[in-house]
Curated annotation (Swiss-Prot):
Protein's recorded name: Periplasmic trehalase
Chain positions recorded as substrate binding sites: R159, W166, D167, N203, R212, S213, Q214, R284, P285, E286, G317, E518
Keyword annotations: Glycosidase, Hydrolase, Periplasm, Signal
Endpoints of the signal sequence: 1-34
Assembly and binders: Monomer.
Any one Gene Ontology molecular-function term assigned to this protein's record: alpha,alpha-trehalase activity
Biased composition (Low complexity): 554-570
Annotated EC: 3.2.1.28
Organism name: Salmonella schwarzengrund (strain CVM19633)
Active site: D319 (proton donor/acceptor), E503 (proton donor/acceptor)
Amino acid sequence: MIPPEIRRSVLLQKAIKLALAGTLLTFASFSATAADPSSDTETPQPPDILLGPLFNDVQNAKLFPDQKTFADAIPNSDPLMILADYRMQRNQSGFDLRHFVDVNFTLPKAGEKYVPPAGQSLREHIDGLWPVLTRSTKNVEKWDSLLPLPESYVVPGGRFREIYYWDSYFTMLGLAESGHWDKVADMVANFGYEIDAWGHIPNGNRTYYLSRSQPPFFAFMIELLAQHEGDDALKEYLPQLQKEYAYWMEGVETLQPGQQNQRVVKLEDGSVLNRYWDDRDTPRPESWVEDIATAKSNPNRPATEIYRDLRSAAASGWDFSSRWMDNPQQLSTIRTTTIVPVDLNALLYQLEKTLARASAAAGDRAEASQYDALANARQKAIEMHLWNNKEGWYADYDLQNNKIRDQLTAAALFPLYVNAAAKDRAVKVAAAAQAHLLQPGGLATTSVKSGQQWDAPNGWAPLQWVAAEGLQNYGQDDVAMEVTWRFLTNVQHTYDREKKLVEKYDVSSTGTGGGGGEYPLQDGFGWTNGVTLKMLDLICPQEKPCDSVPSTRPASLSATPTKTPSAATQ
């Protein structure tokens, strides 16, 4: 475990903005070890900056089916020397770019295909996967895009060879359900380390993910750990919770009504809410060619604007969805940064409530009251600006047109999940979700078929869990059971047929993995494993747990959420 003094070290924000703005700076090597997040450590540069024209040429040549492959490749020597060699050789007769890459880089190894023992139940399969998906990267190669972490961690699986921020919370739910509290503690420690090192939790532990975060679930992770360790977990990680909050709220003190700065927005009435934002406005290294093609398809918009909105959608976790687009069939109409997301603000409400609880646990009642006041102000802003009264559901706010958006998405359940919804509105959301999103195989992400992976007909494990728990918070147990039972049936049928759990599911039926998006369907899969275990224990009583989904639907869920309802639910 990381010593508390390292966890609590107060670090200055790194010079990330300059390094990640796209300027090719002289490379300063950094200690590729997770021993100490020292403030003297330079922010490591992503491969598109390190390798400049070489990176661009390799990605545009499409040497690899997945653009993430070269983004994850490790230079075998100083990148500046490789780049100099490239500039000298590339115009020579017979130059072979693929051979040059093979000589100068170590490509990521293809993961060994896991073959589970025959006859395993769903629970046995998941329990057997935890060690398969566990990684340890305390030390990495000098120029690796992988960022070292002090403790072991569980990855999602497939092409996702690193830890991911919001994925990890749902993975942790399963680890806790399996009794692996040591792994939960290790992963929380890693995220605390990242906050100390970088000022925030990046999208994943790669240099090219440092310019953005993801849905802020760190507070939920601390609350989960506190179920096992008590208030000590809250007190121990209070400094990191405060730093994460500072990251999301950076610049709020200088905003005038109607202005935005990075991740924070002040509306005309003075309400403060947040949006997703990436500090860079260039193509994503892991999807370089795709982003360039998207920008070129809409010459009426500046390419940098499109790149920023693509990156910010990646920060949202919903990459990509009609939710962020003017035209669901045209990705280049994406404008994530002009949308105030309801789910993000619900999560930040939870962060403020957890900060209040942690401050109280640490004995600082005055600070606890301040965080409670911030949470109450955000809750009022959610009710004022993120409720669509005409449609009867929570939705996103459109900064460009100064109005609430009409689209219903699974994000509408997040205010229920964090107990921030008014009771009468929660009932309306439950009815809307049941009428428009509930499908034979679970809850659809949206009702729009755009070909993007965060749209119909796909359903995702984390959104099933948020919906089921949120609905239970407000006594909507019948709808919660339908979401839980239908999704579990989908997972079970797919497992019966393919002997694996996957990243996303087609919820228009049962037994089929989802499609769409930038890459093939991935298996593993961290958050599906975690949510499946939790749901198995929801539908089966504690005295008679089930290892697979039973053949007949139970009359009711066997457990209820343990969160204490906020004043909004009274």
